[in-house]
């Protein structure tokens, strides 16, 4: 009997030791089930489905990752409950949420439940993987062969090769690093981020640079029961850096942490899909609009909406898109840069009485409505979408009620709403559209934040954004906003936080959070931002932001306001340690203010009587070949101007220097014919770099002051020698390389220089290319001087665009003002002469 008792005791001890050993192998946890984390130890585990979807898996990983960063505790992810004593966090749909009778029914567009019990927390939304119907389901692999195969299947399916494959850009939505697609449903992920925000987490900027996390060793199980639906089903910000397939992990995660997503966008310029293949161009040239006596084939072509067969083809295409790909909506919007057609069929279709923004409204919207009416008969629950854009912004005067399936994407210039008149005009147009549309939420808006980030002064407009988004709640299904300041390469892990987001990160953050809750107090949201993002500089940065917003309309023209803003910012800089995260964030804003500092310098120079430097607009860089041949069509469209003496006003030298100039949105182009004295030959070409002795002989000087830099100098001799440098006062920086592409062509008694000078907006590389914004309009112009120096009998002879009054090109207050398009005064005069009808 005693022996049996000893054996039982030994068994009990063995079982106890085995239990203790197993417990040592498991993550540290607490015994009570009231805490997710207690004293740095795990008090919960994360439960997901046996076969989780892509986004469900990511949601669990994000929760695990951030709980660890916040508390140091490691929560286990499992497909089943492993310890009844732990809090169960059910992330996404599983057999456990089914047993608790929590359903995803009705949770559309990333809506979610957050429900707690005595020992569990449900974070539940729709997490379905995006379905990829139709030919091209494997294009996301970015395999060119798969694209070719899909196109063959598509052509066979539709019986011809006129239509563009709908799924051709699917690769852009797939993140290889995360293993998710942009259109995957992500309701549970939104619930995870809501939970983390309730703990104090914020994501103001991509990566750890913009991450704000609390530090705590204890996280209680919240008592919560709520269902959250976004105020706007569609919450899209687009641009090359905002496509999962082109961007990187930190940018893709930032987008999701902001809450972007929801209802997919049907796209813009949908008519491209039925005219942008060679078969249409070859077999149906009449489907392209007529301009200047020729069919518009350039850039894949622009359609003639009156042409025979185009409407019928578009109707068939849209129905095929709905049937084969399961799309809910389709765009039938005309191509970008759509202009009036001069063919006989289009005569009388235009409405100049509706003003510049309505001259094509009746023409375009009749076409859209005709497509919609036919499609409505077979697909009444699908949407036909077109953007009110360009010359068809105004609602049509010949249609009282649009077909019920027409959804209008209104061109919403929110950045300009700091001007009450522009906002009133936009709302007036919106209300006119609402009279003609029948569905509950009949439109989306299309905006563009690019120019907010490209402004020479800080364009922070959180209150304007809040006011406009509130006005759209309930009548607008969502928004589609372009942001093209940022490029994918600037988001690589080895790159610093991009300066191009220094302004727009706040505009984007505010927009994204208001899309979920339009009625929240914007000042509470902003005060939270100032405190969490700038720490010890909270009050000073708040004063800076508020001053910038209050004076945003006039600051670009006021040196006093720019100086005041810079002074306020200087107070914030004094509050932070530059090496701290707060100092780095303030430092990023400081870099973005270089354009304001340069604008202040420009405004301080008297340039009231300078001449105009007006390049011809080049739309397509690809067609321009730098070879010294000025007989190309793009140069033939421009006129020569002759350079004049620098120190004798209006004197044209006998030995001429002729100049042509052009500009695209990314490069400045110059062409010069430099006459020489009869019988004089230049030396053999020798493309030598950065030898200052070039200035002792003959050369062409190109001096460019952008909106962000004092000025750049590029000097080129007839022998092909080049010197390029940055000039800032007395400082000369020869490290800078313009990366200019140039060619010199010599003939008897003249030499020709053709040059392409690239530029980048908010160029993060200080040693390459011009740093400057495309000077559209005169609010942030460039200042340029182009000159030529030659020598006769040992005496220098100078001629240039600007009359400097001395034997020098470098008199900055005389540089010619360069901007594209009309000046503010010219636009105001035109608007007064021809008011746009309300």
Task: Identify the meaning behind each predicted range.
Residues 105, 109-364, 376, 407, ...:
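Feature activates predominantly on carbohydrate-active enzymes
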Residues 38-41, 82-83, 114-117, 324-325, ...:
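Extracellular/periplasmic catalytic domains that process cell-envelope and extracellular macromolecules
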Residues 11-19:
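Sec-dependent signal peptide recognition
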Residues 58-61, 65, 69, 190-193, ...:
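Solvent-exposed, polar/charged alpha-helical surfaces in well-ordered, non-transmembrane soluble domains
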Residues 606-838:
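Structural preference for beta-rich elements and adjacent junctions enriched in aromatics
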Residues 19-23, 30-113, 126, 219-225, ...:
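Acidic, contiguous N-terminal accessory segments
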Residues 1-12:
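N-terminal secretory signal peptides that target proteins for export/translocation
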Residues 201, 215, 224-228, 323, ...:
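Substrate-binding groove of N-acetylhexosamine-processing glycoside hydrolases
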